[in-house]
Structures are given as structure tokens and as C-alpha cells.
Amino acid sequence: MDRKRLQEIWEDGLHHRSFVAGGILTVLMLSLAILSLIWTPYSVFTMNIAGKLQPPGELHWLGTDHFGRDVLSMLMVGAWNSMAVSLAAIGLGALIGIPLGLTASARKGWIDEAVMRFNDFAFAFPALLTAVMLSAALGPGSFNSIVAIGIFNIPVFARLTRGSSLSLFQRDFILAARIAGKGTTRICAEHILPNITSVLIVQATIQFALGILAEAGVSYLGLGTQPPQPSWGKMLSEAQTMMFFAPNLAILPGCAIVISVLGLNLLGDGMRDILDPKMRTRE
């Protein structure tokens, strides 16, 4: 996209309520996550049993957990861990899925058939169930969570890339590129990818939200981020036995997940409407 087009998208976005609302929520959560890399009110690795389960107050704005750790600090570091896993998983899925989709649409034949059958098999299982099963098979840990969540992102990007690029290969400018002697790989890099980038960005935003949910799910089951590193799913798991006398320990990470997922979905819907006028909805 050139600079003029980016400016038009930005101006359209400022007048789109879903885009603005989603952008504000997403920037808020991303800011907390990034801030945790350089500052948190308290260390999340320091326990203070004497100060456990304190209610929100002047020293601990959101209270403390059953180990005396500051809940706000836990939420901030948990935001980074959850979002980093989700982003890395999207990168893995896109890195494999996009070339698969391009190869299928460019080569057709048995390659296209094999990619489509792989997609059909992958979509036969719910995404979260797939992530949980793969995490259980690979073992607990953030890296294995990235691999597990990334694997269910592969068919998403492969199918979207294939569907978006099929019609482009029949366009006149692609035929002209072939006549000019350009190979398939060069055509994909110079002509196909730039024309489907907007669609891929929108899908990546939606997958980011799903990745946060998936990471929370596998961490809740003890298969994701491991102690002493906090994550929103792990915080929910640890708080479930304390709901009646310390409900904030479960409500706060739950709200963080909801706000992040809601913000990303609103942002994705807004980007879809702005980048694809045919999908624009009346507000």
C-alpha cells in the first residue's frame, strides 16, 4: 500500500465506530503488556504470604493473590505472556499457511487437492480442542503452546490465501507478468501478495483474538505458560477455588481476556469494512 492509500484508510477508520472502539481497547491492553517489560508495581516473582488475599487498596490497587503477589503486576505480565504466545502462533501459522495457499492456487492439480484435504481435516475439529490436544501431546510450556496454536492457524491462512489468490491468477496483469518472463515465485511475491495483504491483516487480527482465548484455555488446564510466569488462564485456574471470598482474583483476568478479545474483534470488523467496501455495514 502506498502512503496515500494508508492515509485514506486512517481517515476512514477515524469515522468507523467499531474500528475506533476496538483500536482503543487493543492499544490499552497492548500498552499494559509492553509496559510490563520495563515496569510493574511489584515483582511477580516475589511472594509475601503475610500479605496474601488483600483486597484492593492504596498499596495494591487490585489486591493480592493467595501468595501475596500484586494482582495488577500479574495482569500486566500475564498480558505480555498471553499476547506474545498468540502473536508468535499467528506468525508460525502465516509463515507456513500463506506459502501453502499460494502454492495451491498457483500449481493447482494434486498440490491444490492435498492442501484442501488438509484444510478439511483440520477444520473438522474445533480450534480450541485442537490446541488442547496438541499441547497435551507436546507437553506443557509456552513454546509448545505456540506450536500447538500455530498449527491450527496454518489451515486458516492457507485457505484464505488460496481463495483470495485464485481469481487473481486469471487477471490480465498476471498474464502480462508471465509473458514478461516472470516465474511463479516472483509473481506471487510482487503481484499476488500485495493484493491480498489487506485480507490477511484482517484475518490475522481475528486470529490474534482467538489465539489469546486458546492460550488462556491451555494455561487454565496447566498445559500453557508455567509458573512462576503468570498468564491470564493460569490466574483463572488458581482463583477458581477462591471465588466466594476473593472474587476479584477470577473476575479481573476474566475481564482482561474479554476486553482483549472484544477489542480485537471490533478492530478486525472495522478493518474489514474499511479495506473491503463490499463488506461495509450500515451503522
Predicted regions and their residues:
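N-terminal signal-anchor/first transmembrane alpha helix
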Residues: 1-42, 118, 196
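Membrane-cytosol interface at the C-terminal ends of specific transmembrane alpha-helices
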Residues: 90-91, 98, 102, 140-190, ...
